[in-house]
């Protein structure tokens, strides 16, 4: 391969660190692909005019951090593992904060820079389209009223909200031995669970693909992620059991309803099989159910309802309220909730009262259930119309119907795409989430269909048709 790195011997940063960071940057930008072979140590040292020992030092660090791997008799290759398994190069504080790993994926940076384009169509977003958000009525609140309600704010959250959450969402779960911790959305819940339950070097198993691989939380803490392949019913239970036996897995994270990013719903049979495996191996489950209020029909039993003591449950209303009002909850056995509260106190990180008051007001309304059902019907209608639009592209893009949530998952049927091929989406102003943000796969994409109303369906169709032709013709 052509050696593209250049080192500056006048910089204070050691040469091996310069080489390490440049190789990481090349991997992130798609210049080096998973499985691609790196030049031999001697050849690399000669090309860069540095000592071979400097090259060896950089490569050993990269291997320990999960970015490359050595294969007996076949040299050094870029690791096949997902982004979430790769850790930052921690040498000194100044190099930690400049580490390429802690920066967002270059594709996301490009997308953000273009997202304000007049002719762009943003289907990358993780939010419900603003025209679909229910019009909840919130009572006027004086400052005295807010200060009065603050008296009901406990270390685990606002008491009236906790009571309403149990009434609305957990009627089928025994409350004895369980408690609720109010959070600023499910991602904060994940963050606190990492702090309390895991230490650097621990491993979490999850679906492949999964939005967990797009979060920097794990790499920053030195936590490893292992993906388990899915079929239409959910993760492969045999693969899960083999992974548990092979690796010391501390937690299993699942998004069983309208999974992010694939939109799949795990079958009831598969839910029970997974619980059986996890109970056999005493493996706790984190159930992220943030899309539960966005289902089109009757929902399946949650993992939490099937195994209350085995499952830590994450819920949220942020998907209905919009991302500007972040409020969620974590339901778990009492001892874990107490540990999470202690961790929050140490860092003085409390959940704001105002979003909790708004959530309480919404759930208290007699019309809440009716509005939620109306939203579900609007989503179903928009989803069906979007699926009909996709029919024109079924020879080139594979997709499956969904039962709820925000996302469709499209997979390219032709020759395998590379990271660079996705630049055409940015050029055409169709903003989506490529699969390499969630997995090693580079030939699929996540689309948020909810902004695609009747007018935007035509725009979407035109843009996707143009992109499809360019991809088929090699751009």
Annotate each predicted stretch with a short phrase:
Residues 376-387, 397-411:
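Conserved glycine-rich beta-strand-loop-beta hairpin in the small C-terminal domain of fold type I
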Residues 1-140, 345-351, 412, 423, ...:
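N-terminal basic, amphipathic alpha-helical segments
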Residues 126-143, 152-164:
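A structural motif shared across PLP-dependent enzymes of the aminotransferase-like
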Residues 427-448:
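Conserved PLP cofactor-binding pocket of PLP-dependent enzymes
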Residues 149-281, 293-294, 298-306, 462:
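Conserved core of the PLP fold type I
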Residues 28, 64, 171, 245, ...:
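The C-terminal cap of the DNA-recognition helix in HTH/winged-HTH DNA-binding domains
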């Amino acid at each position: 391969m052509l050696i593209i790195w250049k080192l500056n011997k006048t910089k204070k940063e050691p040469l091996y660190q310069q080489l390490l960071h440049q190789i990481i940057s090349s991997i992130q930008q798609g210049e080096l692909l998973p499985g691609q072979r790196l030049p031999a140590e001697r050849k690399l040292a000669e090309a860069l005019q540095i000592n071979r020992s400097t090259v060896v030092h950089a490569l050993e660090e990269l291997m320990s951090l999960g970015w490359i791997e050595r294969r007996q008799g076949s040299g050094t290759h870029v690791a096949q593992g997902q982004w979430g398994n790769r850790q930052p190069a921690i040498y000194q504080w100044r190099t930690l904060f400049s580490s390429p790993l802690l920066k967002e994926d270059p594709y996301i940076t490009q997308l953000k820079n273009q997202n304000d384009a007049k002719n762009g169509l943003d289907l990358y977003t993780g939010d419900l389209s603003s025209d679909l958000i229910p019009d909840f009525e919130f009572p006027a609140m004086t400052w005295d009223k807010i200060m009065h309600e603050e008296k009901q704010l406990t270390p685990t959250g606002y008491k009236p909200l906790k009571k309403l959450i149990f009434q609305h969402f957990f009627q089928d779960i025994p409350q004895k031995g369980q408690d609720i911790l109010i959070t600023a959305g499910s991602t904060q819940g994940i963050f606190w669970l990492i702090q309390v339950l895991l230490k650097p070097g621990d491993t979490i198993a999850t679906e492949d693909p999964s939005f967990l691989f797009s979060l920097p939380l794990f790499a920053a803490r030195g936590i490893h992620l292992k993906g388990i392949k899915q079929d239409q019913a959910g993760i492969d239970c045999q693969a899960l059991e083999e992974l548990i036996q092979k690796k010391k897995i501390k937690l299993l994270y699942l998004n069983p309803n309208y999974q992010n990013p694939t939109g799949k719903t795990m079958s009831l049979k598969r839910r029970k099989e997974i619980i059986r495996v996890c109970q056999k191996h005493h493996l706790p489950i984190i159930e992220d159910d943030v899309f539960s209020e966005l289902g089109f029909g009757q929902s399946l039993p949650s993992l939490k309802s099937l195994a209350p003591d085995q499952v830590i449950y994450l819920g949220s209303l942020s998907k209905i309220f919009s991302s500007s009002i972040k409020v969620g909850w974590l339901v778990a056995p009492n001892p874990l909730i107490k540990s999470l509260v202690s961790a929050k106190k140490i860092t003085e990180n409390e959940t704001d009262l105002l979003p909790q008051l708004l959530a309480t007001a919404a759930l208290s309304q007699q019309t809440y259930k009716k509005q939620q059902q109306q939203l579900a019907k609007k989503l179903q209608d928009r989803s069906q119309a979007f699926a009909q639009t996709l029919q024109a592209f079924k020879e080139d893009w594979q997709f499956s119907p969904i039962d709820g949530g925000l996302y469709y998952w499209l997979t390219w049927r032709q020759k395998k795409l590379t990271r660079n091929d996705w630049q055409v989406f940015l050029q055409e102003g169709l903003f989506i989430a490529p699969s390499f943000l969630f997995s090693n796969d580079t030939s699929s994409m996540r689309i948020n269909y909810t902004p695609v109303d009747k007018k935007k369906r035509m725009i979407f169709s035109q843009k996707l048709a143009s992109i499809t032709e360019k991809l088929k013709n090699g751009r």
